Design a protein with these regions (language model features):
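Short, electropositive alpha-helical surface patch
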Residues: 100-115
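Histidine/acidic residue-rich metal-binding segments in metalloenzymes
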Residues: 109, 146-168
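Glycine-rich phosphate-binding loop of ATP-grasp-fold ATP-dependent ligases
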Residues: 134-144
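Divalent metal-dependent hydrolysis catalytic cores, especially in the metallo-beta-lactamase
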Residues: 57, 73-102, 118-132, 159-168
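Histidine-rich, glycine-flanked metal-binding segment
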Residues: 1-4, 8-48
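A general structural detector for well-ordered alpha-helical segments in enzyme core domains, enriched
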Residues: 71, 75, 102-106, 151-155
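Di-metal (Zn2+ and/or Mg2+/Mn2+) metal-binding site signature of metallo-dependent hydrolases
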Residues: 45-67
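Short secondary-structure boundary/capping elements
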Residues: 43, 67-71, 144-151
Length: 168
């Protein structure tokens, strides 16, 4: 496939009008011998790397802390529709029971066959409960805890190793 006339973000951190060829899952900046049906005129459009969202709680009426694979499906589908290719949704500072449910639902979601129209699930951003009371922002005070490696390990095990970021 050949994408023609796109404004491509380059190594020099500027956009320039270029063609992008790709085949067998690999991109190239050299033209291919593609048929007209295998080319796309991207005049006036920008080609950028896929975006990675490492901190968001929810969207479109769904929240990561809803604790269901279905909620994650809605988050991943929406994020992909706006150019995000990978997500690392953030928890809130919630009860141990709720956090455990969130971790289990993330594991269940991640182990399922995922539709190609969803952003990839890169992991979990655990925003709390190990945060400072003085820097809590919108986090619930009643669920803030001191750092606890045993509790973290329990959650990490429940998630199947998906916790990638921990806010403290």
């Amino acid at each position: 496939m050949l994408i023609k006339n796109a404004f491509v973000f380059g190594e020099d951190k500027t956009f320039s009008k270029r063609n992008i060829a790709f085949s067998d899952g690999l991109f190239s900046d050299t033209d291919c011998n593609c048929s007209q049906e295998q080319s796309f005129d991207a005049s006036g459009l920008y080609a950028i790397p896929g975006l990675v969202d490492i901190h968001f709680h929810g969207c479109m009426g769904h929240d990561f802390c809803d604790g269901t694979p279905e909620a994650i499906h809605h988050l991943a589908t929406y994020e992909a529709s706006v150019g995000v290719t990978s997500i690392c949704p953030a928890t809130m500072t919630v009860s141990e029971e709720n956090l455990t449910q969130v971790m289990q639902s993330a594991r269940t979601y991640n182990e399922a066959e995922l539709p190609s129209e969803e952003a990839a699930f890169a992991g979990i951003n655990m925003e709390g409960p190990f945060i400072s009371e003085s820097k809590k922002g919108a986090q619930a005070s009643e669920h803030i805890r001191r750092c606890d490696s045993a509790f973290f390990e329990k959650l990490q095990h429940t998630s199947g190793g998906l916790i990638k970021l921990v806010d403290i």
